[in-house]
Curated annotation (Swiss-Prot):
ATP binds at residues 194-197. This is Bifunctional protein HldE. Keywords: ATP-binding, Carbohydrate metabolism, Kinase, Multifunctional enzyme, Nucleotide-binding, Nucleotidyltransferase, Transferase. It comes from Ectopseudomonas mendocina (strain ymp) (Pseudomonas mendocina). Residues 343-473 are annotated as: Cytidylyltransferase. It catalyses: D-glycero-beta-D-manno-heptose 7-phosphate + ATP = D-glycero-beta-D-manno-heptose 1,7-bisphosphate + ADP + H(+); D-glycero-beta-D-manno-heptose 1-phosphate + ATP + H(+) = ADP-D-glycero-beta-D-manno-heptose + diphosphate. The gene is hldE. The active site is at residue 263.
C-alpha cells in the first residue's frame, strides 16, 4: 500500500474516557540520602502534560484534527492545569468537575532522563453516567469518529450506551480497552488491546497463528468490526472478518520511553479514519506514529510534520528524486537534527568523472547535498538545439544513484533563484574559476546569512566536449 498523509483539518474526533494529569519533577541527582538508601533529587523543573484520554485528544489536535474531549476531573489545581493545557492545544474539553474528589495525577520523578519513581494520586469517581451520555450524544452530531479511552478509572460507566448512540448515527467507535471483561465493548468498530491485555482475555498465544485464531473468535463473540493487537517490538496485527491478517513490523528507530504509545496509536487511527483513510492505511500511519513517540521522553504528542516525514521515509523519499514539497519537508527534518544543507545546480546532461568528483567535493561542504537540475526546456534554451541528450527523469535518476547526492530536484527556470529562495541552503556551491559575486543566486544566499563557495573544476572534463566528440565521429 502506498502511504500518504490525509487532510486532518476536516476530521473532527470525540474522545470520551479517563483523563489524568501527567506531572514530571525533573532534577539532578548527586548523592544518597542519609535517611535511607535512596537518591536525593534536587527538583529544578516541574512539568505538566495531559495524560490518559486527554493525551489521546492532545495527539489528535497535534495532527491538525479538531478534537473534542469528555471526561471527569476534580475541582482542583490539577484540573485547572489540564484545562489550560488542552485549551492551549486547541482541544475542546467538556469536564464533569466533582468536588471533594481529586483529579487523577501521575507524578514521575525524573533525573538525567531516567524515571526514578512514580506516585499515583487517584480515587474512584462517582460519575454521573446519564449526564455524560447526554453530553456525548449532543456532541456526536459534529464528529466523524468516537474514541473510548478506557483506563478503568471510572469515567466510562456504560460503554454500550455510548457505542449504540454512535452506531445509530453511523459513526465508527474505536476503543482502547482495559480490564478482564471485553464484552462491554461489544459492537465497537475497532478495539486496540496490547498483547498483554489481549492474552488476559483469550489466554496465551504460542505463535501468530494462535493469535489470529483467538482474535477471530473474539471478534465473532463481540461482533467487532476489527481488532488491532499492538505487540511492542513485534509491531501490530490487524484482524478483520473476511480479510487476511495484516502484520506490520515495529517502526521505532530508537525506543526511549513507551509511555503513552497506546494513546498515540488510537489517536492516529481515529484521526486518519475520520479523514477518510481505509483501515489498513490508518493502521500503517498509527504504526509509524507509535515508532516516533517511543523515541520521546514521557507522555508526548506527535505533529503532522513529524508523521509526514515518517511517511516519506517509509515511501523511500528520504533520499533520491523528490518533488519540491517533499524536499522542503526533508530539509526541515535534516535541520531538526542539526544537519548543514548544501545546494548545487546544473544541467548534468551527460554525467562524467568531473561531475562525480565535483559532487563529492560539494557534499564535503556539509551534511546533506541537494542537486537541482534544469528541466529539458530550460536546458534547450541554455544549450541550444539538440540538447539535452538525456531527458530530465533519466538525468535525475543517475544523479540520485550517486553516494554523494542526497536529494535531486528539477526546476523549470533558466536559473535556480526561485528554488534558492524556498530552500535557503546553508551553503551554495558552484564549480568554476570565477568570483563569488558571479555565482547566480549568491546575493540571495548571502542575504539570509548563508555561505557561497566556488570549487575548482576537474580539467579535461566537459559535457559539451563529449557531445562534440560523439557528433564528429
Amino acid at each position: 500500500m502506498k502511504l500518504t498523509l490525509p487532510r486532518y483539518d476536516q476530521a473532527p474526533v470525540l474522545v470520551v474516557g479517563d483523563v489524568m494529569l501527567d506531572r514530571y519533577w525533573h532534577g539532578g541527582t548527586s548523592r544518597i540520602s542519609p535517611e535511607a538508601p535512596v537518591p536525593v533529587v534536587r527538583v529544578e523543573q516541574i512539568e505538566d502534560r495531559p495524560g490518559g484520554a486527554a493525551n489521546v485528544a492532545l495527539n489528535i489536535a497535534a495532527l491538525g484534527a479538531p478534537a473534542l474531549l469528555v471526561g471527569v476531573t476534580g475541582e482542583d489545581e490539577a484540573a485547572d492545569s489540564l484545562t489550560d493545557s488542552l485549551a492551549a492545544a486547541g482541544v475542546e474539553a467538556h469536564f464533569q468537575r466533582i468536588e471533594d474528589q481529586p483529579t487523577i495525577v501521575k507524578l514521575r520523578v525524573m533525573s538525567r532522563h531516567q524515571q526514578l519513581l512514580r506516585m499515583d494520586f487517584e480515587e474512584p469517581f462517582n460519575t454521573d453516567a446519564a449526564a455524560m451520555a447526554r453530553e456525548v450524544e449532543a456532541l456526536l452530531a459534529g464528529v466523524k469518529v468516537l474514541v473510548l479511552s478506557d483506563y478503568g478509572k471510572g469515567a466510562l460507566q456504560n460503554h454500550q450506551v455510548l457505542i449504540q448512540a454512535a452506531r445509530k448515527k453511523g459513526i465508527p467507535v474505536l476503543a482502547d480497552p482495559k480490564g478482564k471483561d471485553f464484552s462491554i465493548y461489544r459492537g465497537a468498530s475497532l478495539i486496540t488491546p496490547n498483547l498483554h491485555e489481549f492474552e488476559t482475555i483469550v489466554g496465551g498465544c504460542a505463535d501468530e497463528a494462535e493469535l489470529v485464531s483467538k482474535g477471530a473468535k473474539l471478534m465473532r463473540e463481540l461482533e467487532l468490526g476489527a481488532l488491532l493487537v499492538t505487540r511492542g517490538e513485534h509491531g501490530m496485527t490487524l484482524l478483520r472478518p473476511e480479510h487476511a491478517p495484516l502484520h506490520l513490523p515495529a517502526r521505532a528507530r530508537e525506543v526511549f520511553d513507551v509511555t503513552g504509545a497506546g494513546d498515540t496509536v488510537i489517536s492516529t487511527l481515529a484521526a486518519s479514519i475520520a479523514a477518510g483513510e481505509e483501515l489498513p492505511n490508518a493502521v500503517a500511519l498509527a504504526n509509524l506514529a507509535a515508532g516516533i513517540v517511543v523515541g520521546k521522553l514521557g507522555t508526548a504528542a506527535i505533529s503532522a510534520p513529524e508523521l509526514r516525514r515518517a511517511v516519506q521515509r517509509e515511501e523511500g523519499s528520504e533520499r533520491g528524486v523528490l518533488s519540491l514539497d517533499q524536499l522542503l519537508i526533508a530539509i526541515e527534518d535534516a535541520r531538526a537534527h542539526g544537519e548543514k544543507i548544501v545546494f548545487t545546480n546544473g544541467c548534468f546532461d551527460i554525467l562524467h568523472a568531473g561531475h562525480v568528483t565535483y559532487l563529492e567535493q560539494a557534499r564535503a561542504q556539509g551534511d546533506r547535498l541537494i542537486v537541482a537540475i534544469n528541466d529539458d526546456a530550460s536546458v534547450s534554451r541554455l544549450k541550444g538545439p539538440g540538447r539535452p541528450i538525456n531527458a530530465v527523469d533519466r538525468r535525475m535518476a543517475v544523479l540520485a544513484g550517486l553516494g554523494a547526492v542526497d536529494w535531486v530536484v528539477s526546476f523549470a527556470e533558466d536559473t535556480p533563484e526561485r528554488l534558492l529562495k524556498q530552500v535557503q541552503p546553508d551553503v551554495l556551491v558552484k564549480g568554476g574559476d570565477y568570483g563569488i559575486d558571479q555565482v547566480v543566486g549568491a546575493d540571495i544566499v548571502q542575504a539570509y546569512g548563508g555561505e557561497v563557495r566556488v570549487l575548482g573544476l576537474v580539467e579535461n572534463s566537459s559535457t559539451t566536449a563529449i557531445v562534440e566528440k560523439i557528433r564528429n565521429k
